[in-house]
């Protein structure tokens, strides 16, 4: 129970990229979330304005900024301690609101939710559902009218905001509350490019902003370096070499446990498979929607010959037993469980710790990022962000809320600098201390096992919910964790697309059409991909492939792309 009734649907566990994708436990990323993550439902938009790009670049190029006053003035303006008069209500229990969020917490206990209750006297009734079931549950709630006061997390999308906000009024406009009572959120909206990205086609802002200094690349394949060493293998650089490595993993006792049959050469995050990204090895760097960047232009690659070439290669490996047979059926806990038993040679993930069972620490683990393959023949990886993103579909307030203004003020207080530090790293005064030269993180290894778990990143805050840290701001760490994402970016940077795929609001007159076609195309793309990979449909049969292509067009592919301003379908 947290600040009221605790709802939790017992199901598969999940560590959201996003959650993990945006903020590593040992790093304080800007304007803090995500994964990127990219994932199947999140809507992130790139702030590609010159000012935003330069701010992110300067943050990386200079010495770490550990004092807020040393930040760029526009960003520094967002770092003042709370401008809310606390507590928000006179007595504990005088006010409350409910919040639906996708999160796989086993206990529902979050350190900073308790801290915010102490600060505000506002009870928050969390309704937590694992991501695997959250979308279905949210749809049921919205259809029944029995939805929470606040809906948060990766289940939201532009389509939902346009439908339930612009069209139906279930999600309420928030900009008047921001201007009246939320000076910190207002300063965040005033950062260059943010307000424009947050504003829906009808001129309203329907969500709490989530602005983040983002990773250039989210999900990538990680390869077990210890297995390579055990078998005397080199890091592969081509798809042929990669397949040969996977075959060796399968045929030999790569994990050294004496059993030559338990190795699983390749797997991926069940909820963020991202296998289509590997079409980039064949010159078609794609995202989960089938969109790609070719020669600097956003195109649709989901019916292209290069995507088919990738599917043929990947399906061939599946038929040879090199791919996890549970690729399309396992849940997160199964994936993580197999990884923690050292059964994987390669897995796609946001970070290797998501599945390996190896905790972050100052030393690099045995896992290496797999480099982009076939680079000498046009292999390229899709750049996810330019280093700075606005997530505009993370938190909405519904018409069931009795006091939307109070909810906005609660978030405005949560966005204070020290609350942001607490949400991302740990409470100031417990895990972080304020010194003359900035905020210092204690060595968490000195904590008891119980406290290490209590103050772990996942237990600080339901991390799918909006939070904020200023761009470029860093904590002082005497013994920082190994920065795996920085290593990924260093390896991938030379072989990534220069541009990113932009997400734009849909024209008001096209909302219903877009929503209907989007669902149909997404489902068809994913279902057909699974059937091709598993061999239920022959990817190498021309008639079968043409039937797939014809089916995509029949669903309205051209209209779907036109609504998004995309004119090219790669052949």
What is the predicted role of each segment?
Residues 163, 269-289, 315-466:
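Extracytoplasmic/periplasmic substrate-binding proteins
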Residues 81-85, 133-139, 157-160, 191-194, ...:
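Short alpha-helical segments and helix-capping/turn motifs at coil-helix boundaries
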């Amino acid at each position: 129970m947290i600040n009221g009734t605790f709802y939790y649907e017992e199901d598969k566990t999940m560590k959201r990229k996003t959650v993990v994708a945006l903020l590593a436990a040992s790093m304080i990323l800007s304007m803090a979330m995500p994964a990127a993550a990219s994932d199947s439902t999140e809507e992130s938009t790139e702030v590609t304005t010159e000012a935003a790009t330069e701010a992110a670049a300067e943050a990386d190029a200079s010495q770490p900024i550990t004092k807020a006053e040393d930040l760029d003035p526009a960003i520094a303006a967002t770092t003042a301690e709370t401008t809310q008069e606390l507590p928000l209500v006179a007595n504990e229990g005088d006010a409350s609101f409910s919040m639906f969020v996708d999160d796989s917490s086993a206990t529902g206990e979050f350190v900073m939710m308790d801290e915010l209750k102490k600060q505000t006297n506002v009870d928050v009734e969390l309704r937590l559902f694992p991501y695997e079931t959250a979308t279905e549950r949210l749809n049921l709630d919205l259809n029944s009218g029995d939805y929470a006061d606040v809906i948060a997390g990766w289940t939201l999308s532009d389509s939902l905001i346009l439908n339930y906000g612009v069209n139906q009024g279930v999600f309420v406009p928030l900009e008047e509350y921001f201007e009246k009572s939320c000076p910190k959120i207002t300063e965040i909206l005033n950062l260059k490019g943010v307000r424009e990205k947050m504003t829906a086609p009808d001129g309203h802002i329907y969500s709490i902003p989530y602005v983040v200094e983002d990773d250039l690349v989210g999900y990538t394949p990680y390869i077990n370096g210890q297995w390579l060493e055990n078998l005397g293998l080199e890091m592969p650089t081509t798809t042929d070499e990669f397949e040969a490595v996977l075959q060796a993993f399968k045929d030999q006792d790569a994990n050294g446990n004496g059993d030559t049959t338990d190795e699983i050469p390749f797997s991926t995050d069940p909820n963020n498979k991202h296998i289509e990204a590997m079409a980039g090895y064949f010159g078609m760097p794609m995202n989960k929607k089938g969109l790609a960047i070719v020669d600097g232009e956003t195109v649709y690659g989901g019916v292209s010959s290069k995507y088919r070439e990738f599917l043929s290669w990947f399906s061939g490996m599946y038929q040879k037993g090199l791919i996890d047979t549970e690729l399309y059926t396992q849940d997160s806990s199964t994936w993580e469980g197999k990884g923690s038993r050292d059964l994987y040679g390669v897995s796609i993930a946001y970070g290797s710790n998501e599945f390996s069972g190896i905790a972050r620490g100052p030393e690099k683990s045995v896992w290496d990022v797999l480099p982009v393959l076939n680079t000498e023949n046009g292999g390229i990886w899709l750049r996810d962000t330019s280093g700075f993103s606005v997530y505009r579909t993370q938190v909405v307030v519904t018409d069931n809320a009795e006091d939307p203004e109070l909810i906005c003020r609660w978030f405005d207080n949560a966005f204070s600098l020290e609350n942001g530090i607490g949400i991302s790293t740990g409470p100031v005064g417990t895990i972080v201390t304020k010194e003359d030269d900035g905020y210092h993180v204690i060595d968490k290894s000195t904590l008891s096992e119980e406290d290490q778990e209590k103050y772990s990143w996942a237990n600080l805050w339901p991390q799918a919910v909006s939070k904020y840290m200023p761009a470029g701001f860093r904590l002082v760490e005497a013994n920082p964790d190994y920065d795996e994402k920085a290593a990924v970016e260093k390896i991938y940077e030379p072989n990534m697309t220069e541009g990113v795929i932009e997400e734009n609001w849909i024209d008001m007159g096209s909302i219903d059409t877009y929503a209907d076609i989007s669902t149909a195309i997404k489902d068809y793309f994913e279902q057909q991909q699974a059937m091709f990979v598993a061999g239920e449909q022959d990817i190498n049969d021309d008639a079968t492939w043409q039937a797939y292509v014809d089916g995509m067009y029949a669903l309205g592919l051209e209209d779907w792309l036109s609504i998004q301003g995309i004119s090219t379908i790669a052949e």
